Amino acid sequence: MPLSTQSSDSLSSAGRQSFGVNSVSDFLAQFPIPTNLPSNKWQDIPVTFLHDNEIALIDPETSMEEASSILIDRDLSALPIVAAKGSNEIATTFDYADLNSFLLMVVGFDDFNDGRFKKVAEDIRAGKVITAYEVAKLGKNKDDFITIPHTTSLGRLAEILSSGIRRVAVTNEQGELSFMASQRSIIRFLWNNIRAFPDLEPLMSRTIHSLDIGSTDITCISGDQKVAAALRQMNQTGIGSLAVVDAQFRLLGNISLVDVKYVTRSSSVYLLNKSCAHFLSVIKSEQGIRAGKDSAPAFNIYESSTFAFTLAKLVATQCHRLWLVQSPSCPPSPKNNAHLSPGSMGGVKVNQLLGVVSLTDIISVLYAHMKGTLPPAPHSAPSLRHGRRGSTSSHRSHSKASVDTQRR
């Protein structure tokens, strides 16, 4: 059984928020050592070992309806759009941020000041067929479309992704696009094969506190706010997910751009006017139906959570960030509660939101560990760093990627 499946079941069945430093080795020892890899150094493994699904290309004439169906039904994170039918040149990509932007234009829940958006909105109201390309080329904060050859090592890929780039395209021997390699896919591969890489095992017992990663530059929304407000906030800020909190700043759940798929059907548009707290229950129900059980991922970790537990949770939840919340056993560092409102300072509550840890943070740690520049465990309180790219932060002090790969 894959480590991710086993660890996911273990996390949910035990109901634990972390496994301690002393139990990490015992936990990892349950699983066999993979024997099908060409090296015991993860950074030397070819990127082709991340290949788990084919790339899906669309052309400039593909309608929004068709592109959205491909994106959702195939469970993809993005669709490259070729410059013209039959071309290998990539013009841009279509993703959930574009789908969210389109939905807001359709229902009129955003005030688009940009004249280009107004033109598309007018075409929508006139009943014209809108293409995915028309919407995608209006997208905000898009990564450059980067391609790397199939011979690229995971170490080089980690260098690229630690800069905050979320995904790259991998080409085959003929130079044709083969598949997408993402931050999430490299983390999933390393976690599933962790026993094959003994150099990583000492890192697994380090805590979020000792690694000093994360950011207090968090974006959240109240549970009583409407879903439309959450989608609008993500569209305007360019971030990929929001923490949903109650009046005491306690974490209720997470709404991400991917969750826009639950409101794209005409029968579910009414959810846009429901509260975010209600929407969380809808998401839980939908995910439970797909998983065949009444369960939903928990997107929170503690400062005391180990790196191993954090990886396991990222793989199990398939999310792009985890919310750092107050542990029931440890008080937060003064710096971590500086953003809390004066009314909430009478006593920091369990599950109170403190910060966010992103995939970029995690890959930055892996890259720094590979380079030998990861600082040793500190003895002082952690200081969460203010992030970049929305709520994402990274160790710029020990992760300075020079991205010079081919950009299309």
From Swiss-Prot:
Compartments reported by the entry: Cytoplasm; Nucleus
InterPro entries documented for this protein: AMPK_gamma/SDS23_families, CBS_dom, CBS_dom_sf, Ssd23
GO molecular function: protein serine/threonine phosphatase inhibitor activity
Region of interest (Disordered), ranges: 376-408
GO cellular component: cell tip; cytosol; nucleus
Source taxon at top rank: Eukaryota
Role played: Required for normal DNA replication and for proper mitosis. Induces sexual development and ascus formation.
Protein name: Protein sds23/moc1
Organism, scientific name: Schizosaccharomyces pombe (strain 972 / ATCC 24843)
